[in-house]
């Protein structure tokens, strides 16, 4: 089973409940199994997010902008894997929809947010 990311750490979910994504074109279950987080995981994630938001509020705008640009670059570096998985989970065509529209829109929004942070 996949782990949950809470407070920067991948860990086992508190609950043993899980689900699998299904390819809507074939109705076949995809191989990965994902946890259904319970309230303990949700509370821990929310507490970590609150703490991170407070820390992030004190960062200079350029640091936030640099992070957003690096995030966009990371998505682009892994674009083939992201598009492939999104295709399996949604049955949307890899091209043009996912690779040529959705992924560039996502990275474009991240870069626009980075530019806005730099501009103040």
Walk through the language-model features, giving the residues of each:
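N-terminal Rossmann-like NAD(P)+-binding subdomain of aldehyde/semialdehyde dehydrogenases
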Residues: 1-120
